[in-house]
Amino acid sequence: MRKYNDKHIPVLPNEVVEYLLWKDNGIYVDCTAGEGGHTFLIAKKCPNSRVIAIDVDLEVLEIAQKNLKAFHNVILLKASYVDLPVVLKSLGIERVSGILADLGISTYQLKAEGRGFSFNRDEPLDMRMDIQQDTSAHKITNFYSEEKLSKIIFKYGEERFARRIAKQIVKNRPINTTKELVEIIKKALPPSEIRKRKRHFATKTFQAIRIEVNKELKNIEQLLKNAEELLEIGGRLAIISFHSLEDRIVKHFIKNSNNLKHIAGPIKPTQEETKNNPRARSAKLRVAERI
């Protein structure tokens, strides 16, 4: 296990419990098990329900297994929510009572040494949520064309200096570490732009590359389609997003669906929660019911 000392705190815990868990003798799916924070709450609140918890990250599932060992109603599996129909079929399950997804990067992935998600440490460029997949941040930064890099950084990072950054990336290849990438981004941006940004100047580019590595937005669309098919009548879908690109997809899908009814959201964390868990500050929860 990698060096990792942070304690994970699930985002919007009370709200997830309130809106997702509408019956105790159901089947609930946590599509992003992570360290097991939300899964723990679901299993504890609904002891007569089956809880299927999946994640693509084998390392984080090891932590979840320890955190959830007291529960006999939880099944932990290494799988992507893109493949949820196959996962449930293998368990003999046709319909479920609730589906939860806490999107984006996990605390473990950001803080554990050597995963390459953070611009605050010097690590090999990686950013894979599933460490068994081939495509990594190193592959994208070193082998994508300047045009393709520019499109990704603009589209997924909403970075208006995408062309300048892409040009510098190609010019400074090979790029092997997060620190090298940060310095290249810094070189590409006007000094005045760096000074006026509230967040770290590399945030947008790192987000864009991470989304491309893990096909995050494409996968969210598939998750929503899966949920629409797999939820029983009255079943709940709860999605926590952390940036506008994710939230927009969820919002529009629910709005345009003939089978889902919007029942809550966007629900944002209270001031007290963001004080205790700064990661929660940009979280938005949207909830829909299968009709």
From Swiss-Prot:
InterPro entries: RsmH (IPR002903), SAM-dep_MeTrfase_MraW_recog (IPR023397), SAM-dependent_MTases_sf (IPR029063). S-adenosyl-L-methionine binds at G36, G37, H38, D55, L88, D102, Q109. It comes from Thermosipho melanesiensis (strain DSM 12029 / CIP 104789 / BI429). It comes from the Bacteria. This is Ribosomal RNA small subunit methyltransferase H. Residues 268-291 are annotated as: Disordered. The keyword Iron-sulfur does not apply. NCBIfam families: 16S rRNA (cytosine(1402)-N(4))-methyltransferase RsmH. Belongs to the methyltransferase superfamily. RsmH family. Keywords: Cytoplasm, Methyltransferase, rRNA processing, S-adenosyl-L-methionine, Transferase. Its EC number is 2.1.1.199. Specifically methylates the N4 position of cytidine in position 1402 (C1402) of 16S rRNA. It is found in: Cytoplasm. GO terms for biological process: rRNA base methylation. Its main location: cytoplasm. It catalyses: cytidine(1402) in 16S rRNA + S-adenosyl-L-methionine = N(4)-methylcytidine(1402) in 16S rRNA + S-adenosyl-L-homocysteine + H(+). GO terms for cellular component: cytoplasm. One of its GO terms (molecular function) is rRNA (cytosine-N4-)-methyltransferase activity. It is an enzyme of class 2 (transferase).
